[in-house]
Amino acid sequence: MTNLSLFAISHIFALSFCLVNITTIAETDIKLPEIQIHNVLSESAAPVKVQITGKPVILLKYNDLYKWNVTRNEIIYSTAIFGHYSANWHAFDPSSDAGHAISFWWITTDGIFQSFDNNNYELRAKWVGDEW
């Protein structure tokens, strides 16, 4: 009985080790992008406060660009505050953003826009607050 139990335990340990390694390999195969957030409001506009999950608050003045590399394949929540307005969006969403080299974000008067080629932008979040 002891030999069988030792045999079973050693196989369970080996199987667990293999599963952990397979999971690690699978996660490293996923290409995670660089994120670039660019304030393109206007030169006369007040700076925008941006809060990204796990990062300090960033103050972006006109034409400022903030960038970093995604390190985990999970949703990254973001909030931008501009005067009495706010907008919430996913700076990174694995279901749509993984596999792209760069995720470009523009902060504009209409809201937050995303592009993967830095040419074609799509609205991802509208400002919420008092009317413009």
Model region roles, listed by residue range:
Residues 2-73, 77-132:
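Intrinsically disordered, low-complexity segments enriched in small/polar residues
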